Regions:
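A general secondary-structure signal for short beta-strands and their flanking turns/coil
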Residues: 2-4, 17, 46, 436, ...
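A carboxyl-terminal module marker
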Residues: 676, 680-703, 707, 743-753
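Inter-lobe coupling/hinge segments of SF2-like helicase ATPases
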Residues: 206-213, 217, 221, 230-668, ...
Length: 753
């Protein structure tokens, strides 16, 4: 029963991010505890701000202390482990306390300020979501007159099989208005039911024995001691594409549950969650919860509460699922561990690997990283004994790795084929269609045409708010910026600079879809990119259709490259990858190798052998050739030599300090001043290993009218270095610069902001 509490408030700057002491009203003392979400008066005007209690009985009561406005229900209270994660994130990522809290609690579970019935007193909303919804059942017959509509007939037909909820009927295209009209006629009866917490109740429980090959069993046996030991362990499961890593996951999860413990499974993208959920729910039943950003607020909250109440034994999701309030964790799996999506690009800028390692340490769990193309850092750590290395070298079922052909697109153009689809690719797709098989094509550019260039002055049409070219989207007939969302509608025909004619060039997924339709008019083509998967559950529905062979060809961006498993896919094509070969960032080659290896591995995963074609203007590129050969070990030796020569991770830590603001001169001045302050502080610790580069403009100099500069610091990422950055940030905040820039610190960057 605390009488005073220390509260971290929302919207605090780094310099003012500390605990503020508040008095607790007598009627609140039974509900306030560490981790409580509260509403507090802040500042001279006592404006209402959200906060989290991080200390109790912070100091003796004082007449000067303000009282809490309101306290959220106990269900919104952070668990002790999640509270420790808040402190962990603040220390590791230079975020504020409340930024860490917002990362830990999903948006749908965050209480918001409102006012009491008097219209004045600040309070917290009383309920996050309605936990009930309408349900309808058939109680009468549909009268013949007036003539029933098609929707009314459909509703009656659906409800003939039993009661259904409004949300289930809306998914079938039946609106609430139709249902209410039928209720008024006495055909239906409406009642209130609790919202379903099981999002995938239609998946049948198979509960079949998990049968492993000899090699998979050996991998499982090697990992089992780390799972059974009460101390934390980490391991890297490195297996070629199609080697059956997921089966090893399932066997480990099964044993984890038998031990009375729980499992957390991370996948890098939302597109990969449906297949993983299907495997887990069909094997383990209802006690599987899901956490990712494609769920609506209600779904996320209900899933969160299910986990918090102990109703889930397994949680599967994307990066943010690492913060699930799961207790007694015995196993944490990070699938496709090399993916950049496990690193957050907004505050707090955390790595899911780092948080997973912390949670494994807290729970005495096994942290299992898995990939066919591990990150260079993870494989280096395994080679040097810092984590256990377990290999799967054979494809499941004994299938060979796909044969790969590299096509030189320069030679293709010279021979008279101006199209973006080579003759070899065209022949292979046609042969695959005739055989009744499916094809996956990777093109890492969405849109129709990617560049609008003036024929006279050669100027490229760029976004007015960003220093990047705009992309033409034919379906919407507009130019879009993929960074800030700006658009030109309709697209200009003339150059804004000189009035010359604009020529549209480039090749995106929309144009690829159109060209494929012309070449193969009989083929059913599915496009998978950010535009076609924006709707709720779009990933799941489109992939399910492809699995049912409702499409012959799937063309898409990176989301088609990883983790997908379709038996009838025997051909994979890489249409455009060259731009990534010349991308900025020290992980560029690793990204290309991983992407090509992963997408090639989508073919030939069942009884039929696979084949892949890589189109490129650089056919002798060693990275592409090593990816074509699926030779990770050779790639690693080449990459680690480059990292050592250039002093990049794993041979150092890489910290990027980013600066952004509306005036370039002020951003440049701010970055230079920060660099000077950092140098001054570092000089006090001459034994601290440090190499400072810059400041320089960012890789993309302007985004959304904000100019960007960066300072790159090669360091040893330890507490001592982080304290140095923290001291410098504090000094910078105290400076009275005429125009300051926003500062961010990223310890997991590829080298840019």
């Amino acid at each position: 029963m605390p009488k005073t509490v220390g509260v971290a408030v929302s919207n605090a700057t780094f310099h003012f991010d500390k605990l503020y002491t508040y008095a607790v009203m007598p009627d609140q003392q039974d509900t306030v505890r560490l981790g409580s979400m509260v509403l507090v008066p802040f500042g001279r005007g006592s404006r209402a701000r959200m906060g989290v209690v991080l200390a109790c009985d912070a100091e003796p009561e004082s007449a000067k202390l303000k009282f809490l406005f309101d306290v959220a229900p106990a269900s919104a209270c952070l668990t002790p482990e999640l509270l420790r994660l808040v402190h962990f994130l603040k220390e590791r990522t230079f975020c504020t306390y409340y930024e860490a809290v917002k990362a830990v609690i999903p948006y749908g579970a965050q209480y918001k300020p409102t006012v009491a019935e008097d219209g004045v007193t600040p309070v917290l909303q009383k309920q996050l979501v309605r936990h009930t919804e309408n349900a309808y059942k058939l109680v009468g017959t549909l009268p013949p007159k007036p003539r029933p509509t098609a929707k009314q007939l459909a509703a009656v037909a659906l409800l003939a099989g039993g009661e259904r909820t409004l949300s289930a009927l809306e998914e079938k295209g039946i609106s609430r208005a139709v249902l209410d009209n039928l209720c008024a006629k006495g055909v239906l009866e409406c009642s209130k039911v609790n919202k379903a917490i099981d999002l995938y109740s239609s998946i049948p429980l198979k509960n079949e024995p998990i049968l492993l090959t000899e090699e998979q069993q050996a991998a499982y046996d090697a990992l089992l001691p780390g799972l059974e030991d009460a101390a934390p362990h980490s391991a890297l499961l490195y297996g070629v594409t199609g080697s059956g890593k997921t089966l090893v996951f399932l066997k480990l999860i099964e044993h984890c549950l038998q031990m009375g413990r729980r499992a957390l499974v991370l996948v890098p993208e939302i597109s990969l969650t449906p297949q993983m959920i299907l495997r887990l729910k069909s094997q383990f039943g209802k006690r599987v919860a899901v956490q990712h950003s494609a769920l609506n607020h209600t779904e996320r909250l209900l899933q969160w509460q299910m986990i918090q109440d102990g109703g889930a034994d397994i949680v599967v999701g994307t990066r943010s699922a690492i913060f699930s309030p799961l207790e007694n964790i015995g196993l944490v799996i990070i699938d496709e561990e090399q993916e950049h999506t496990y690193r957050s690009e907004s505050a707090p800028r955390y790595s899911a690997h780092e948080v997973a390692r912390q949670r494994a340490a807290e729970n005495g769990a096994l942290l299992l990283l898995a990939s066919a193309t591990p990150s260079t850092e993870s494989y280096y750590a395994a080679q040097h004994g810092r984590t256990q290395l377990v290999r799967l070298t054979k494809r499941y079922g004994g299938n060979p790795l796909p044969k790969v052909q590299i096509v030189d697109m320069r030679a293709e153009l010279a021979s008279g084929n101006p199209r973006e689809i080579s003759l070899a690719m065209e022949d292979a797709i046609r042969h695959n269609l005739e055989a009744g098989k499916q094809t996956i094509l990777l093109l890492n550019r969405r849109g129709y045409q990617t560049v609008a260039q003036c024929e006279d002055c050669r100027e490229v049409l760029k976004c007015p708010k960003c220093s990047v070219p705009m992309v033409y989207h034919k379906s919407a007939h507009k130019l879009l910026c993929h960074y800030c969302g700006s658009q030109l509608d309709p697209p200009p025909a003339r150059c804004p600079a000189c009035g010359g004619k604009l020529q549209y060039r480039g090749f995106g997924t929309q144009k690829a879809e159109e060209e494929l339709a012309k070449l193969f008019p009989e083929a059913r083509i599915l496009r998978m990119d950010q535009d076609t998967t924006a709707a709720k559950d779009a990933h799941e529905k489109l992939l399910a259709k492809f699995a049912r062979h409702e499409y012959d060809i799937m063309v898409g961006t990176q989301m088609v490259a990883k983790g997908l498993d379709f038996e009838d896919v025997t051909l994979v094509g890489v249409l455009g990858i060259d731009s990534l070969l010349f991308a900025q960032g020290f992980r560029a080659y690793e990204t290309v190798f991983s992407l090509v290896t992963q997408v090639v591995g989508r073919s030939g995963r069942a009884k039929d052998p696979g084949f892949a074609i890589i189109q490129t203007t650089d056919p002798d590129n060693p990275v592409l050739n090593l990816a074509a050969a699926q030779d990770y070990d050779a790639f690693f030796e080449q990459e680690i030599a480059y990292r050592k020569l250039g002093l990049y991770p794993p041979f150092c830590g890489l910290c990027v300090v980013g600066f952004a603001g509306p005036k370039e001169s002020e951003v440049a001045r701010a970055s230079a001043r920060f660099a000077a302050l950092l140098g001054r502080q570092a000089a006090k610790q001459p034994d601290l290993p440090l190499r400072v580069l810059g400041p320089t403009p960012g890789g993309i100099e302007k985004i959304n009218d904000s100019y960007r500069y960066k300072l790159t610091v090669k360091c040893r990422n330890d507490r001592r270095f982080r304290n140095l950055i923290r001291e410098t940030l504090t000094l910078y905040e105290q400076e009275k610069l005429p125009g300051k820039a926003t500062v961010v610190v990223d310890l997991h960057s590829d080298g840019d902001i």
